[in-house]
Amino acid sequence: MKGFTKHSILMACSIGLAINATAADWDNIPIPAELDAGQSWELQQNYSDSFNYSGKNSTFTGKWKDSYFHSWTGPGLTHWSSDESWVGDGNLIISASRRQGTNKVNAGVITSKTKVKYPIFLEASIKVSNLELSSNFWLLSENDQREIDVLEVYGGARQDWYAKNMSTNFHVFFRNNDNSIKNDYNDQTHFTPTWGNYWRDGFHRFGVYWKSPTDVTFYIDGQKTTKGAWSQVVMKDKDYTGAILDKSRYNMDQEAFIIIDTEDHSWRSEAGHIATDADLADSDKNKMYVDWIRVYKPTGGSTTPPTGDITPPSGYTNLQLAHSNRCVDVINGALWNGSTYQQYSCNTGNNNQRFKFTKIANNQYSINAKVSQLCMELASGSSANGAKVQQWICNHANSNQTWSLEDKGSNTFEIRNKQSGKCLEVANSSNANGGQIRQWACTGATNQRFKFL
């Protein structure tokens, strides 16, 4: 266990062995998120902590508050208390106990003293508690309107499914004047442990690369998750109106505090899923451990900002997706009206993937497939998300066959339909061959970004 390793190092120091006092626990653990060409990671000292000290000394108080960032004492039966967090044995410890004389729960919480903002990578090594309470690692904007949950799990839930399934979550809140919730657009994505039976069985790494307001991706035990990224979620106001969020207007665009805590959520306690007095008093169950947290920003590199209109090649070219590195492909090399497109492994010698851009007006083009000599068309000129994109006999007077290229930087661009104003994308951010090419509201996500190949 990590605490044992740190204790051993201290013993080694006492007998005179030389060690690097500035080494961090994560130094030999690669950062799993990918950088753009020429970039490097820069450690953010104000938020990174190995917890290689005891008590809440100046290192702790220089980075963290042992309370929430404002006066709220927590959801449901939660009562956040500074007495329920401390540093010892090389870990931050977040505990819980019964609040004397009440049915409430004293719970630990720490909050970063200042806010973070994209682009930024955060990762923590955490062993969750064995309680009905949730163990959490999350980000929340100061106005309580934007939330990114890197970890939420009921580690000791008596319902097995909840103990085995942690979630990553997004929330976009709209609030009333008294800060009560008017709308809560959210989506959750669940994951079982990469090893062991329960998340409480040991330390796991939970990370997020908040690259931009529309590019947020999670990492578990050093692996990028295949689901749950901002580009993949459907944000629904489940508890209020049932409406779907327009992600082309609202996204993860606000700076946020880092929060590590435990909570008794009202929806669970109201359903009878309550931490018992015995469990809350059990020192083997009532603690969440954080071995370390590291935070980095990407710096430097040759990444170029948007500069204006994109100029296509004069001849035929492939269209490569930024998120999957696969190419737009006419399915089965079809030659008829109404046939459709997919993404497929790139092959510049495959005519199914070769397209020519014919200029119609300033930054307006038709897109002609070499294999069929048919043009890319938005079926029926639909404005709906998910609308079919098909091949059809070319007619440059049709606005549903007219596309503009919007520069997104780093030699990538969006392809927008003139009639609908919406973007081409790969459905559900699929990385697989056969991923559907369709129309969707423009979000800036990488499954809507293309480059010439």
UniProtKB/Swiss-Prot annotation:
CDD domains: beta-trefoil_Ricin_AgaB34-like, GH16_beta_agarase. It is found in: Secreted. Its EC number is 3.2.1.81. It comes from the Bacteria. The keyword rRNA processing does not apply. GO terms for biological process: carbohydrate catabolic process. InterPro entries: Beta_agarase, ConA-like_dom_sf, GH16, Ricin_B-like_lectins, Ricin_B_lectin. It catalyses: Hydrolysis of (1->4)-beta-D-galactosidic linkages in agarose, giving the tetramer as the predominant product. Residues 313-453 form the Ricin B-type lectin domain. Keywords: Disulfide bond, Glycosidase, Hydrolase, Lectin, Secreted, Signal. GO terms for cellular component: extracellular region. Belongs to the glycosyl hydrolase 16 family. This is Beta-agarase AgaB34. The lineage of its organism: Bacteria, Pseudomonadati, Pseudomonadota, Gammaproteobacteria, Alteromonadales. The gene is agaB34.
